[in-house]
A protein has these predicted regions:
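Polar/charged low-complexity regulatory segments
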Residues: 2-43, 47-48, 52-243
Length: 243
């Protein structure tokens, strides 16, 4: 899930909160779909795996995504709308997209992912920017410490700096718009699933390795807000610069 600068600004001026959609489909069993039907975003992949989005990942719309974000992850209307509107550049003429459409490089998908290879990295001759990379994930966990420490803004800042250096070494580039997306993407799971400023390590493993939101996330009805996400992005940059 990604948030562009333009859609963030629009979201901040989205007043009112329409009533949270009531679920009419309770078949949210986790059934992992094939990678051929998935994109580089583990969050949207998880929503499809759990039935909040069509399980085949096809013919999605921003409205469907917004409803899924509000239903499954209890996002506020401004946050869900801002995230779903960021998908507009990959829509077909009929207003739909498929999850694999998100693989298009430097539109929404971008370099410096925590768990995916950069598109043009020397060790990525096939330009595979969507497959989960276990070694990258282990490096991410190691940034938080050698034991079972949780993921915090401080450890995320360490990950952010490390991935920036690795990407630059491999020739990766980010424009201002995608830099903003990358900052908020780095803290997005913390905003969605964190408690007490921390992500429990087991939860993080479930999310990235299985592409599934654990019950403790979907059953936590606290509202996730756009301002909360932006605040965490600012704090991340503070840690990057000063910590």
């Amino acid at each position: 899930m990604h948030l562009t600068l333009t859609n963030t600004i629009r979201g901040l001026f989205t007043f009112g909160s329409p009533k949270k959609p009531e679920s009419t489909d309770h078949s949210y069993e986790y059934i992992r779909g094939p990678i051929e039907e998935r994109g580089p975003c583990p969050g949207l992949n998880a929503l499809a795996n759990q039935g909040y989005l069509p399980r085949d990942g096809k013919n999605l719309t921003p409205a469907l995504v917004s409803t899924a974000l509000r239903t499954a992850l209890h996002m506020s209307h401004p946050l869900a709308t801002s995230l779903s509107n960021s998908l507009k550049p990959i829509l077909r003429k009929d207003g739909t997209f498929d999850l694999p459409s998100m693989r298009a490089h430097n539109i929404i998908e971008h370099d410096r992912s925590i768990t995916r290879l950069d598109y043009s990295a020397p060790n990525n001759p096939t330009h595979d920017n969507f497959t989960f990379q276990p070694a990258m994930f282990e490096a991410f966990l190691a940034d938080a410490g050698p034991g079972e420490e949780g993921i915090t803004l401080k450890s995320l800042a360490k990950t952010y700096v490390r991935r920036k250096k690795e990407s630059k070494k491999d020739g990766g580039k980010l424009g201002l718009g995608l830099w903003f997306v990358n900052v908020l993407q780095t803290v997005s799971l913390l905003n969605t699933a964190g408690k007490g400023g921390e992500l429990e390590r087991g939860l993080v493993k479930t999310f990235y390795e299985e592409e599934r939101f654990p019950d403790l996330v979907v059953e936590d009805e606290r509202t996730r807000t756009l301002l909360g996400l932006l605040g965490k992005g600012v704090l991340l940059l503070w840690h990057v610069v000063f910590a």
